[in-house]
Amino acid sequence: MSEVFEIVKTGIDFFCNHLVFFNMLFAIVIVFFQRRDPKSVWAWLLLLYFIPVLGFVFYLLLGQDMHKRKMFRIKEVEDHISKDIRQQEYRLRSRDVQEMDDSIRGYEDLVMYNLEAGEAMLTKDNDVDIFIDGNEKFRALMEDLRNAEQFIHIQYYIIKNDVLFNQIKDILIEKAAQGVEVRVLFDAMGCRSVRHSYWKWLNEKGVQTAEFFPAILRRLQLRINYRNHRKIVVIDNKVAYVGGFNVGKEYIDLDEKFGHWRDTHLRICGSAVLGLQVRFILDWNYAAGENLFLRPELFRGIEAGTRDFCDMQIISSGPDKTTQQIHDNYLRLINKAQKSIYIQTPYFIPDEAILNALMIAVKSGIEVNIMIPCMPDHPFVYWATYSYIGDMVMAGANCYTYNNGFLHSKGMIVDGKVLCYGTANMDIRSFALNFEVNAVIYDEKRAQEMVDIFQKDLEVCRQITRDYYVARRLKIRIKEQICRLLSPLL
C-alpha cells in the first residue's frame, strides 16, 4: 500500500514541478493550432496562467476547438442538387438572375455568398406562416404531425418530458404504429433532464431517437460547449418548421417564472423544405451512425406552396464549418442597409465586426432598433447583453426591453425587404460554437409583416435611454463589466 502511495505522490510531485511546462504546452495549442478570436486566445491564456489546474479543467470542458474533418463527413446529397447549385451560380455571375425576380435585386451578392459558402439553394415557390405564440405554433405542428403519411423528422435543442411533449409523444407513437417513419434528434446538453430510459422506451414504441454529442458519463460532458441549437421539423417533405421555440411547458406560457413566452417560428411549404430536410439528415447521420442519403425517397415529394410565393435560402453554421455563414449574413445585411435595421434577440453579445457595423450604420443615419428581454434566463449573458446594449444606446440606436414576459425571438429585418430568422442568437456562441440554422427570406410582404410585429411588440416595451443607462448603479456596472470581460471565454 505504501508503494502505491509513493507512486501517486511521485506523480503529483512531477505534475506540480512541471506545471509551467504543461501551461506553456496548452498555450501553444491554443495560440498556434486552433482557429480563435484574439480576445478568446488572451482570455484562455490568462486563465491558464492565473488558475493553472482549474484553468486546464475549464479548457477541457469549454475551450476545445472542433475541426470539420474530425467531426463530420459531409457527403453530396444528390447529383442534381449539386448541378442546380452550379447553374444558379452561373446565372448570378451572368446577372441573368435579375430576369427571374425583383425580390432579390440588390441582394445578388448575398445569394451568391450563401451558394458558395453553404450550398444554400435559392428557392422561389415557398409559402411562409409566421408564429409568435407557442400555443398557436404547437397546435399547427400537431395537426401537421397527425396528417403525416411517410415520415416525421423532429430536431430540438430542448425537449422536456412534460405536458407539451406528452401530447406530441402520443401522436408520434400513433403515427409510428401506422407505419410512418418517426425520428427524433435531441441535444445531450439541452435534454439532460430527460432520463435515457425514456428515450429507450420511445424507441421500443417505434419512435427512433438519436442523441447529439452524448455524455461519456451521465454528468461528464467534454463537449459541453458545442450544442446543437437547431430546431427543425420536416413532415413528408411537404411542410417544415424552423425557429426559436423548443419543446417545454414554458414555451406555451405555463411557467410562472417567465409568463408569456414571445418567440418566432416559421412554417414553410415549398422547395425550401428540402434545405431543412438535408440539414436534419446531416445531423441525424452523425448522431445515429446511419446514412439516410442512401434513401432517395426521403428527398422526393417536394410540393410548391399554394399562396403568395417568396424567395428563400436555408443557411446553417456550426463549429464544424470553416465559415460562420449566419454571422456573415447578418454582417452583410447590416452593411447593405439603407434605411432601417430591426433586431430581436434574447442575447446580444456581438463580436467586434457586428458591433462596429451596427455603430457605423447608426452614425450613417440608418434607423437601428434592437429589442432584448427585460428578465434573465441566464444571468451571465443577461449582464453581458446589457453591457453591449449600452454601447448601442450611447451610439444613438433605439434599444428596448420587452416587458410582457420573456423575449426569445431571434432575427433581423433590413429595409423592409429581407428578413433572417431562425435559431441563432445575436451572440458569439451562436456564431462560432452552436450548430444553428436560419431562413433568409427575400420578400417585402413577409419583411413588412415582421416589421409590423416588431412595432406591435413596442407597445409592451420600455426604451433604454441614454439618461437611464448612464444613471445605473455601480453594482450593475460592475456586473456588466465582469460578464463582458469573461464573454470571450465562450
Feature roles, as predicted:
Residues M1-D328, R332, K336, I360, ...:
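N-terminal localization/anchoring segments of enzymes in phospholipid and broader phosphate metabolism
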Residues K205, E367, M371-H378, T385-Y386, ...:
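Cytochrome P450 I-helix active-site segment
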Residues H327, I334, L355, V368, ...:
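A general structural signal for well-ordered alpha-helical packing
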Residues A337-K339, Y347-N369, P373, H378:
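Helical hairpin unit composed of two closely spaced alpha helices linked by a short loop
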Residues I343-T345, Y402, Y421-G422:
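Thr-Gly-centered strand-to-loop micro-motif
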Residues A353-L355, Y382-A384, V414:
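Histidine/acidic-residue-rich catalytic or RNA/ligand-binding cores of hydrolases
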Residues K410:
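Catalytic-core elements of nucleic-acid end-processing and repair enzymes
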